[in-house]
């Protein structure tokens, strides 16, 4: 009730933050005259001065005004660009670990230099994260002269980069790269066999460009490094032949069956489900082709893998469409990012789905993969000490940024007011009518000399639009995932008078459409241009620029609404940059995916009530509101999926941190003899306790079993029964002590034979191998657990709590297995006197061979589809997402452990740590 009044009196929180920062802007401006008076050498020397002051204890916050003034002056001298006051506010926002929302054309790349320069002074490294390799290289090369003038080094990490180059890039003060590459390098580092093979330093400060795309859109899909498993290509081929014989079961809204079939498709949750008739039919067909034994069920324990293949085939045929979710390029299935429209070469779907699509397209089927390491962007980016980001559209997702990452969104005021006109949506009954109206709009704009950008949601739609325009004889350029190599060239000239560009969602994120075209690109295309040529190109551009402004600026036409309002706003934002004229219009039909699945009934009834005829369109705020409501519904569902992924991965993440900490400790240690001694004692205690129950009588002891277990686990044959017969005073504790001494003596004898140095090297290698193999198997087990855990909802159990409980049990077993298997291998194996350097070189060769076989998957989120049990109202504990790692508190020894076991920390993971 009083909120509007208080806001009017005191302003919004965002306005108050801007006012606070404006005071610092004034201090920065006060330094400007002093900086202008400095020579280049004196200005450059400021960096060394700042580093010295930091070494003496001065904070970055205190340095900020002077450092920003230095960066601004360097920008003027090197780039010919002076930071506006609002850009200084953007730089402060980044330094404070917040998200800066800035409109298109407001100079986000230049803003980043302020926060990056200041934080690079600490010497701990700064990562600048972009959405693709092109932008990483472009921004690094663009800003490199500025940073190098200021005495800072710049590196770029790219896929397939030689290790030496990549290591040098990470050692630089400022490192550019994509979110995928940073994430995969983190996983690779935790698979390395020596500290020298690692790339990344401690994760200090990251600036994420297009932060909404990376932290929101891509958060649903985990990063997975996998290796090849057994070949099942024949199985995929056979099942692919059977799938077309299955028919879809279709029901009307009232529940009346119009087509009885074998399976149902839910487009909202992107799931397929076999019904009873489908199960029976597929079992009969599998029996006929010899894949299922006579009388056996698909649900038998040993046939569950076959059932997974059937569902993968169904999904490949019914949910994945060529030129929408993927394209076929050079005999490979290449995935298309649904949010950006870009192809993702090298990325593969998990759970056999990629192989099923290859079978569907009659391509060579590549071997299935097994997970070697995985993480999510949510948990990776929360490892940074400080995280910040920039985008043109973050405010709609401010709640999620705060809930998941603890990041506040600051809306930075524009340098010039927005002059773009956003028209109401036009809704048609059919897609053909919609496309006809779009072409009429295009023709009208072209007669006025206006440039037009037509945005589409899929490659298929962009190609359909292109075909329609070709029939009309209208010249145009197409920008989609098939031709993204030409992206910069096409976008650069998309603002010329009368230019027509068809683009998917990838359209120039990070590349501005300049009205009149981009004169710098024209100059760059010339070999050794003369000053006269450059002057002429600038003059020609000025005329074209004025012509486009007078005609109304860039017209953005959208052929459909995306699931996310954010992506619609990004498309609109292509027009009206830096106060330029421009306009936008969305053309929709009831046949569009979003309308058909989420919003069609209400709008269709409204259109019927108006008595609309073929070819007519409706333009009404009520329709726009209905569509936005549908989008909010989809956004809410996607948020729930991302949140559920995080809640499950938080459990995995705690385990991942323990294993990676253990691994890094092993790698860094020169001598792990104490660790081996601890392992030996723990394994011996567990072995003795299994055969001699605590506080039991000697008659209850399984001495023969203990002798056998000692022989099996430690490679030593000990006459335990004889000891007991000969010594009446040998009870449980003294027996443990005697056994331990005998085992230590046997191991010392092995050390004398092999040599201490050789054995120390061998110990580290064995424990690393055992840890990696068991961790890989553990990840697979956790995947299977996650896939089936939602079924616990039917038993009125909380799936998330059940997952926590069972995963803790599995993890405890994993830690015991690491100790047990390491000791068993070390006890049985014969160690040769080998040159440790040769052994390490051999190990590195094996690691490199493994790396060549690795696949990098940005897979669909496993096991996170909304299960029926949850949708039907079974209560699920949806706790608020945890705070970022950088804010976590250290647990006291007597506090409850974070893993959910119910034990005190000192008796649980505190022991491990």
Swiss-Prot record:
Catalyzed reaction equations: ATP + H2O + cellular proteinSide 1 = ADP + phosphate + cellular proteinSide 2
Protein topology in the membrane: Peripheral membrane protein
Coiled coil: none
EC number(s) reported in the record: 7.4.2.8
Residues where ATP binds: 87, 105-109, 512
A molecular-function term among this protein's GO annotations: ATP binding
Entries under InterPro entries matching the protein: Helicase_ATP-bd, P-loop_NTPase, SEC_C_motif, SecA, SecA_DEAD, SecA_motor_DEAD, SecA_preprotein_X-link_dom, SecA_SF2_C
Cofactor notes: May bind 1 zinc ion per subunit.
Gene Ontology BP annotations: intracellular protein transmembrane transport; protein import; protein targeting; protein transport by the Sec complex
PROSITE patterns in the record: SECA_MOTOR_DEAD
Chief location of this protein within or outside the cell: membrane
Binding site for Zn(2+): 897, 899, 908-909
Matches recorded under CDD domains: DEXDc_SecA, SF2_C_secA
Gene Ontology CC annotations of this record: cell envelope Sec protein transport complex; cytosol; plasma membrane
UniProt family annotation: Belongs to the SecA family.
Assembly, per entry: Monomer and homodimer. Part of the essential Sec protein translocation apparatus which comprises SecA, SecYEG and auxiliary proteins SecDF-YajC and YidC.
HAMAP family, per database record: SecA
Role played: Part of the Sec protein translocase complex. Interacts with the SecYEG preprotein conducting channel. Has a central role in coupling the hydrolysis of ATP to the transfer of proteins into and across the cell membrane, serving both as a receptor for the preprotein-SecB complex and as an ATP-driven molecular motor driving the stepwise translocation of polypeptide chains across the membrane.
Matching PANTHER family: CHLOROPLAST PROTEIN-TRANSPORTING ATPASE (PTHR30612:SF0), SECA INNER MEMBRANE COMPONENT OF SEC PROTEIN SECRETION SYSTEM (PTHR30612)
Protein name as catalogued: Protein translocase subunit SecA
Organism listed in the record: Pseudomonas fluorescens (strain ATCC BAA-477 / NRRL B-23932 / Pf-5)
């Amino acid at each position: 009730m009083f909120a509007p009044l208080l806001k009017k009196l005191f302003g919004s929180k965002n306005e108050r933050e801007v006012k606070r920062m404006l005071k610092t802007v004034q201090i920065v401006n006060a330094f400007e005259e002093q900086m202008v008076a400095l020579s280049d050498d004196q200005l450059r020397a400021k960096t060394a001065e700042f580093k010295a002051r930091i070494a003496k204890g001065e904070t970055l916050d205190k340095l900020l005004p002077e450092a920003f003034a230095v960066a601004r002056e360097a920008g003027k001298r090197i780039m010919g660009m002076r930071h506006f006051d609002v850009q200084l506010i953007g730089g402060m926002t980044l330094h404070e670990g917040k998200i800066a929302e800035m409109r298109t054309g407001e100079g986000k790349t230049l803003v980043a230099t302020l926060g990056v320069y200041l934080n690079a002074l600490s010497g701990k490294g700064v990562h600048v994260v972009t959405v693709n390799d092109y932008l990483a290289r472009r921004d690094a090369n663009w800003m490199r002269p500025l940073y190098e003038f200021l005495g800072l080094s710049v590196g770029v990490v790219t896929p397939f980069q030689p290790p030496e180059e990549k290591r040098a890039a990470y050692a630089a003060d400022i490192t550019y790269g994509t979110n995928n590459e940073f994430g995969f390098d983190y996983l690779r580092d935790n698979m390395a066999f020596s500290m020298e093979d690692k790339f990344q330093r401690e994760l200090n400060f990251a600036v994420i460009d297009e932060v909404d795309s990376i932290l929101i859109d891509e958060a649903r899909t985990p990063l997975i490094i996998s290796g090849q498993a057994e070949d099942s290509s024949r199985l995929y081929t056979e099942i692919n032949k059977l799938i077309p014989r299955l028919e879809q079961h279709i029901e009307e809204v009232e529940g009346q069956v119009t087509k009885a079939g074998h399976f149902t498709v839910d487009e909202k949750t992107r799931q397929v489900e076999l019904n009873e008739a489908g199960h029976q039919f597929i079992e009969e067909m599998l029996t006929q082709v010899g894949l299922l034994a006579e009388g056996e069920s698909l649900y038998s324990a040993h046939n569950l893998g076959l059932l997974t293949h059937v569902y993968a085939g169904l999904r490949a045929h019914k949910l994945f469409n060529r030129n929408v979710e993927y394209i076929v390029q050079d005999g490979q299935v290449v995935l298309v990012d649904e949010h950006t429209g870009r192809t993702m070469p090298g990325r593969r779907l998990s759970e056999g789905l990629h192989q099923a699509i290859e079978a569907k397209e009659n391509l060579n089927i590549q071997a299935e993969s097994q997970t070697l390491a995985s993480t999510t962007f949510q948990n990776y980016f929360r490892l940074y000490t400080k995280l910040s980001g920039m985008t043109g559209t973050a405010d709609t997702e401010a709640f999620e940024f705060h809930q998941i990452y603890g990041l506040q969104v600051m809306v930075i005021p524009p340098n010039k007011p927005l002059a773009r006109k956003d028209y109401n949506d036009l809704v048609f009954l059919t897609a053909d009518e919609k496309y006809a109206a779009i072409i009429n709009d295009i023709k009208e704009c072209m007669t006025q000399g206006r440039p037009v950008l037509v945005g589409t949601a899929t490659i298929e739609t962009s190609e359909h639009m292109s075909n329609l325009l070709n029939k009309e004889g209208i010249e145009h350029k197409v920008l989609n995932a098939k031709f993204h190599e030409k992206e910069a060239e096409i976008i650069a000239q998309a603002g010329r008078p009368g230019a027509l560009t068809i683009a998917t969602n990838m359209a120039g994120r990070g590349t501005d459409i300049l009205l009149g075209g981009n004169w710098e690109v024209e100059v760059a295309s010339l070999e050794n241009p003369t000053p006269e040529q450059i002057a002429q190109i600038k003059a020609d551009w000025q005329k074209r620029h004025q012509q486009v402004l007078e005609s109304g600026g860039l017209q953005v036409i959208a052929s459909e609404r995306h699931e996310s309002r954010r992506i619609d706003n990004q498309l609109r934002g292509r027009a009206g940059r830096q106060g330029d004229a421009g306009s936008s219009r969305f053309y929709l039909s009831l046949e569009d995916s979003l309308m058909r699945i989420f919003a069609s009934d209400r709008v269709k009834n409204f259109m019927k009530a108006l008595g609309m005829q073929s070819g007519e369109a409706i333009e009404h705020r009520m329709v726009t509101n209905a569509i936005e409501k549908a989008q909010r519904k989809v956004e809410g569902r996607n948020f729930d999926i991302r949140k559920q992924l995080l809640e499950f991965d938080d459990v995995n993440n705690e385990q991942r941190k323990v294993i990676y900490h253990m691994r890094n400790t092993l790698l860094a240690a020169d001598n792990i003899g104490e660790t081996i001694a601890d392992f030996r004692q723990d394994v011996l205690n567990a072995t003795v306790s299994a055969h001699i129950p605590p506080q039991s009588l000697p008659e209850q002891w399984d001495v023969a079993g203990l002798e056998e277990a000692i022989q099996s686990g430690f490679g030593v044959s000990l006459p335990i029964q004889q000891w007991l017969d000969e010594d009446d005073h040998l009870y449980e504790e003294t027996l443990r002590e005697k056994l331990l001494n005998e085992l230590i003596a046997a191991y010392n004898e092995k050390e004398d034979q092999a040599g201490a140095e050789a054995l120390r090297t061998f110990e580290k290698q064995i424990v690393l191998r055992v840890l990696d193999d068991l961790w890989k198997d553990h990840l697979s087990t956790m995947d299977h657990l996650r896939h089936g855990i939602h079924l616990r909802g039917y038993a009125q159990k909380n799936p998330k709590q059940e997952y926590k409980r069972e995963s803790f049990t599995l993890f405890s077993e994993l830690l015991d297995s690491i100790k047990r298997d390491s000791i068993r291998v070390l006890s049985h194996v014969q160690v040769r006197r080998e040159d440790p350097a040769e052994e390490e070189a051999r190990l590195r060769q094996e690691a490199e061979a493994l790396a060549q076989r690795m696949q990098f998957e940005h897979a669909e989120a496993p096991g996170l589809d909304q299960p029926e049990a949850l949708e039907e109202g079974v209560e699920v504990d949806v706790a608020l997402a945890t705070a970022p790692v950088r804010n976590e508190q250290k647990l006291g020894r007597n506090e409850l452990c974070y893993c959910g076991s119910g034990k005190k920390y000192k008796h649980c993971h505190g022991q491990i740590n």
